Regions:
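Intrinsically disordered, low-complexity boundary segments flanking structured domains
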Residues: 28-41, 99-104, 191-194, 201
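ADP-ribosyltransferase catalytic core
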Residues: 44-46, 57, 81-156
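ADP-ribose/NAD+-binding catalytic cleft of ART/PARP-like enzymes
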Residues: 7-92, 208-210, 216-228
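Enriched but not universal
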Residues: 1-7
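Active-site and NAD+-binding cores of ADP-ribose-processing enzymes
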Residues: 11-22, 36, 117-228
């Protein structure tokens, strides 16, 4: 059986005998060593998780390039992508897999899998907020963080105005990436910078790559981790 076939046709976790899965283990470890070297070298043993619909102990999946927002408005989705572009980021809200080092957080979206990029990858994260939508959109403090990144002229225009994202004028100012100061944005949004810090922070990490390898978190801990 070819590796791809094996990865796509593994057993359900509740039916697998981990102690008798040596063949699968050897093939998964070999696949990681042959195809995931950039991540292994950059992460230095750290892992991130993604919550996905269960599909076996290990499988590969193409990363979507056309993701649409589910938890936020299209305007905020486009704003976040625009801010990422300001700092030269490649991984954004449209073309990335969303990951976290907090397994429990990943489990709110599905079964927890260790996510490992196959081949080259890019990533974006923020040291200032853990969840972009929750921390920037759902409360007044988040709105203040956005205002703080505006360029001087736009910020002055709003200085004496009650900032209300439901007010048409202030909302249009806030959602336009052209109104932001790139140097200020770069303090809060890191593109391809400090991956180990990103993982250690437990914050949301967007990873852009062609393909992602997913490994059941229990199988990874019990069998795979000590070999990679």
């Amino acid at each position: 059986m070819r590796l791809q076939e094996l990865l796509e046709n593994t057993y359900e976790p509740n039916r697998i005998d981990y102690e008798s899965s040596d063949d699968l283990l050897d093939k998964v470890v070999g696949y990681i060593e042959d195809n995931c070297r950039p991540w292994l070298e950059a992460a230095e043993g750290r892992v991130v998780y993604r919550g996905v619909k269960h599909a076996g102990l290990a499988f590969t999946r193409k990363v979507r390039q056309d993701r649409i927002p589910h938890d936020s408005s299209e305007e905020m989705h486009d704003l976040f992508n625009g801010l990422i572009s300001l700092v030269g980021g490649v991984a954004n809200r449209t073309n990335s897999a969303f990951t976290t080092a907090v397994e429990e957080e990943a489990m709110t979206y599905g079964d927890a899998y260790v996510a490992i990029p196959v081949g080259p990858f890019n990533y974006t994260w923020s040291p200032s907020w853990s969840d972009w939508f929750t921390d920037l959109v759902s409360n007044d403090e988040g709105t203040g963080l956005l205002v703080a990144m505006l360029d001087y002229d736009r910020k002055q225009e709003l200085a004496n105005t009650h900032i209300d994202t439901y007010d048409e004028v202030s909302f249009k100012t806030i959602i336009n990436p052209a109104n932001y100061d790139p140097e200020k944005v770069q303090r809060h949004i890191y593109a391809d910078r400090r991956l180990k810090d990103a993982i250690d922070s437990g914050h949301e990490i967007m990873i852009a790559c062609d393909t992602m390898l997913y490994i059941d978190s229990d199988f990874y801990r019990s069998r795979v981790r000590k070999y990679v």
